[in-house]
Curated annotation (Swiss-Prot):
Gene Ontology CC terms, in alphabetical order: mitochondrion
CDD domains hit by this protein: PaaI_thioesterase
Transmembrane segments: none
Transit peptide: 1-12
A Pfam family that the UniProt record links to this protein: 4HBT
Disulfide cross-links: none
Source organism of the structure: Candida albicans (strain WO-1)
Compartments it resides in: Mitochondrion
Protein name per the record: Uncharacterized protein CAWG_04269, mitochondrial
Keywords: Mitochondrion, Transit peptide
Length: 223
């Protein structure tokens, strides 16, 4: 029994010591002032001119930030929206996020360039899936005990394909929050840039977000 206990506890102990041994700056990075990542200034101005954006930016109950500001610098190159797929004709703006942390509601804006298409010439559904996964999780994180979690399941109902050079908006809302489990629903649609346009529904989604029991130790490890 003693040997069995040692085999089970030694890897966990080594993992914890390994993380704790690294400097705090390496583990968390710096969240100071950062330069906004943007390639397409005209798209950014179009978003800011919409009534929806103006309504959100003037709401004192919402946290307003850009996607790249939500995580340490050393992780940028591995993050899809502002790393792997950020560039000319790809993701051309740093996604703009408005988050109601208390009620678990999120609205975020993206621009999808010409190089994000599939063989049919429309935006690849993998891009849509990534936006939905990351966005719905961001809405649910604040309602978890440690504010961290992993996707347990993600279901997506694709309605229409987004054309290239689309500006899209994600709407997400927590439907259930109980202990270490949060259920979020949301949808992605195109953003009308003038009153004569109507939004095109791209996809609807449901995400189950859970916090593993051992995530609570991240708090004192400062990860």
């Amino acid at each position: 029994m003693f040997r069995s206990l040692v085999r089970k506890t030694t890897p966990l102990l080594a993992f914890g010591v390994g993380i704790a041994a690294f400097p705090k700056d390496w583990r968390k990075g710096q969240f100071g002032d950062k330069k906004l990542l943007v390639i397409n200034d005209s798209v950014l101005e179009q978003i800011r001119s919409t009534d929806r954006y103006k309504q959100l930016v003037n709401d004192p109950n919402l946290k307003h930030y850009n996607s790249s500001h939500a995580f340490p610098d050393q992780h940028h190159k591995n993050y899809v929206n502002t790393g792997l797929l950020f560039g000319p004709d790809l993701m051309e703006i740093d996604p703009i996020v408005f988050l109601d942390e208390k009620n678990g509601e999120l609205t975020s804006f993206y621009h999808l360039g010409d190089k994000l298409i599939s063989q049919d010439g429309q935006i690849h559904n993998g891009i849509v899936s990534t936006i939905l996964d990351e966005g719905l999780c961001s809405a649910g994180f604040p309602l978890l005990p440690s504010k961290k979690g992993v996707t347990a399941s993600l279901s997506i109902d694709f309605k229409n394909q987004a054309p290239p050079q689309s500006t899209v908006v994600l709407h997400a809302k927590v439907k259930e929050a109980k202990g270490r489990k949060v259920v979020i629903e949301g949808y992605l649609e195109t953003l009308p840039l003038n009153k004569s346009e109507t939004p095109l529904l791209i996809a609807e989604s449901k995400c189950v977000l859970v916090e593993p029991k051992w995530f609570k130790y991240f708090a004192w490890l400062q990860v």
